[in-house]
């Protein structure tokens, strides 16, 4: 039996407090809103009780943030794309940010199990004055559990329409991509951290973010397989290849905290669920 679940999440500012409202259809929802940083920032945990997707499953996530609202979204655990008998497993996330909105999109990794046939799509639309920090982390198999990614396909699509597009199809049979030093070089975790602005960011602002990312990279064990660029005036990206998820996630969290301090003068404040 396949699932088609849909979540629509809205952030609004009400009496100087960012408030989340949602409606859902199927096994996809958010937990109680938390305010560890005060009323201005609403923290939410997105949960999918079945715990993963098999062939035929579809998850649709629509997020809208209104003017002056600030939401932070994470997940309690990894997303999982399991073995398919032929049908596609699909997750689509669409984020729309109104003028002056801020959003932090920080889900834990997506794990591609051997035999999966999956797509993970993220589309971001930001009006002038809106800003977002987000990341995308993909694990190909579970190397430490002796569960390699030996067959299957995974399509990864991240897009800011008219500004930035990252799209790649990973096939377990493509040994040149997976093993070549011009491809993944044997790494099994692919991760990106990105800053999206609805207004072209000043060069000095982008250079400050790049400098913070590069300083963290230079001090990290992944310095040979990580880099930061600004392909467009509205985008800054940190990309990482790692043998497993943990070191990549450590680097992303470090730079995320540095970026939110630089951009929004906010202290480090990790979602509480990460500590459980």
From Swiss-Prot:
This is Urease accessory protein UreD. UreD, UreF and UreG form a complex that acts as a GTP-hydrolysis-dependent molecular chaperone, activating the urease apoprotein by helping to assemble the nickel containing metallocenter of UreC. The UreE protein probably delivers the nickel. GO terms for cellular component: cytoplasm. Signal peptide: none annotated. It is found in: Cytoplasm. Required for maturation of urease via the functional incorporation of the urease nickel metallocenter. HAMAP family: UreD. Belongs to the UreD family. The gene is ureD. One of its GO terms (molecular function) is nickel cation binding. Keywords: Chaperone, Cytoplasm, Nickel insertion. Its main location: cytoplasm.
């Amino acid at each position: 039996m396949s699932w088609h679940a849909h979540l629509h999440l809205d952030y609004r500012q009400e009496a100087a407090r960012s408030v989340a409202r949602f409606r859902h259809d199927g096994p996809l929802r958010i937990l109680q809103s938390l305010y560890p940083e005060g009323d201005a920032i609403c923290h939410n945990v997105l949960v999918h009780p079945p715990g993963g997707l098999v062939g035929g499953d579809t998850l649709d996530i629509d997020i809208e943030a209104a003017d002056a609202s600030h939401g932070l979204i994470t997940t309690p655990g990894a997303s999982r794309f399991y073995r398919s008998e032929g049908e596609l497993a699909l997750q689509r996330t669409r984020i729309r940010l109104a003028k002056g909105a801020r959003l932090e999109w920080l889900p834990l990794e997506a794990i591609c199990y051997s035999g999966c046939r999956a797509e993970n799509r993220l589309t971001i639309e930001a009006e002038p004055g809106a800003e977002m920090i987000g990341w995308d982390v993909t694990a190909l198999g579970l190397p430490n559990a002796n569960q390699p990614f030996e067959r299957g396909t995974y399509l990864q699509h991240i897009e800011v329409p008219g500004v930035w597009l990252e799209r790649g199809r990973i096939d377990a049979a493509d040994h040149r991509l997976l093993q070549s030093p011009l491809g993944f070089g044997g790494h099994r975790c692919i991760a990106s951290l990105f800053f999206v602005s609805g207004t072209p960011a000043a060069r000095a602002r982008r250079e400050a973010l790049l400098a913070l990312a590069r300083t963290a990279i230079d001090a990290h064990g992944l310095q040979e397989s990580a880099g930061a660029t600004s392909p467009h005036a509205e985008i800054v990206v940190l990309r990482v290849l790692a043998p497993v998820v943990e070191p990549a996630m450590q680097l992303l969290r470090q730079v995320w905290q540095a970026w939110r301090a630089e951009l929004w003068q906010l202290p480090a404040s990790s979602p509480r669920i990460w500590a459980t």
